[in-house]
């Protein structure tokens, strides 16, 4: 539906089985033009996650959103875009990512994707990023953790470049 988006968040609570969040959707990042409010239940039985359908939006339009709890604590501000109408001739650009392992040291792909998207012409910017996996693994094993002799790499900067370098066939 090009007039709606599904927004998702996770907000753990120490007590209770159900809490309510408020989600606001705005046409500007400063939330001066809020166009929608919705209540979003978070449930212990769903790992304190919530999904909320927000309707009444413009097709192919960028919006900003945030979740707040009853105490006024807020999430980071997110950005979303509604789908275009079926007869919209403009291209819709997708990217996909999958599970990542910090131990392998290849998380710079996310940074590169964002960097290139922010600098692209509007018609070339990403409309959607689909995450195919469900984890970012962040376990780093240290020698004292694995006395049997298996040691993964510790994360460190080997070299820092002031500017990116293009590597042929990389």
PLM segments and residue spans:
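Divalent metal-dependent phosphoesterase catalytic cores across multiple superfamilies
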Residues: 1-170
């Amino acid at each position: 539906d090009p007039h709606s988006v599904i927004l998702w968040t996770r907000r753990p609570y120490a007590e209770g089985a159900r809490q309510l969040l408020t989600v606001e959707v705005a046409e500007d990042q400063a939330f001066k033009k809020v166009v929608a409010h919705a209540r979003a239940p978070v449930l212990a039985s769903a790992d304190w996650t919530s999904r909320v359908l927000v309707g009444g939006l413009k097709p192919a339009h960028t919006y900003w959103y945030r979740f707040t709890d009853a105490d006024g604590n807020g999430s980071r501000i997110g950005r979303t875009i509604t789908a275009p109408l079926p007869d919209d001739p403009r291209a819709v650009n997708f990217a996909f990512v999958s599970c990542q392992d910090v131990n392998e040291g290849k998380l710079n792909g996310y940074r590169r994707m964002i960097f290139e998207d922010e600098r692209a012409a509007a018609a070339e910017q990403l409309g959607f990023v689909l995450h195919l996996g469900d984890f970012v693994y962040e376990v780093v094993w240290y020698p004292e953790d694995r006395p049997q002799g298996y040691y993964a790499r510790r994360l460190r900067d080997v070299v820092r470049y002031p500017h990116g370098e293009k590597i042929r066939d990389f």
